Design a protein with these regions (language model features):
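Acidic, PIN/NYN-like endoribonuclease modules and their adjacent C-terminal/linker elements
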Residues: 1, 109, 113-140
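Short, structured coil segments at secondary-structure junctions
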Residues: 30, 76, 130-131
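Residues at the C-termini of beta-strands that transition into short coil/loop
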Residues: 38-39, 84, 123, 139
Length: 140
């Protein structure tokens, strides 16, 4: 299993070149299932909801809701891995290690560890602090 973290998923969603081209070239030949996780859904949802809350004009709100809707449609087309008891146990183990990594990234790492999955991320600096986590950047 290959999990796209939120940053890599955003590159896919936006078709951000050249990172998108590098990533897709590797994913196209990968044998493992490619998934996203519910934590990425939460992160993107929170971001769009905050943007909607800050929108002042109808045009801004219309555009923001359209992006929120597009995000929802995108997640509906992808396999999404949840945050279950195994992921929570990994998350709690990492908290005890006092790793200096953001909470959401720790949750994503917990899911990847619990699934014995390869995590694709541009944030190698933080994720490489997690013992046992397999993480690579396929966008370069």
């Amino acid at each position: 299993m290959i999990i796209l973290d939120t940053g890599v998923l955003s590159i896919v969603q936006r078709g951000e070149r050249p990172a998108y081209d590098h990533l897709v070239a590797r994913l196209d030949v990968a044998d493992d299932e490619v998934v996203v996780c519910v934590v990425s859904f939460e992160e993107q949802m929170r971001g769009w909801l905050a943007y909607i809350a800050r929108s002042k004009s109808s045009n801004q709100q219309i555009a923001a809701y359209a992006r929120l809707h597009a995000m929802l449609d995108d997640f509906a087309t992808r396999p999404v891995v949840g945050f279950d008891r195994s992921a929570a146990a990994e998350f709690e183990r990492m908290l005890r290690l006092k790793l200096r990594i953001g909470t959401m990234d720790l949750r994503i790492a917990g899911i990847a560890l619990a699934q014995d999955a390869l995590l694709l991320s541009k944030n190698l600096t933080d994720f490489r602090k997690v013992p046992g986590l397999r993480v690579e950047d396929w966008t370069v």
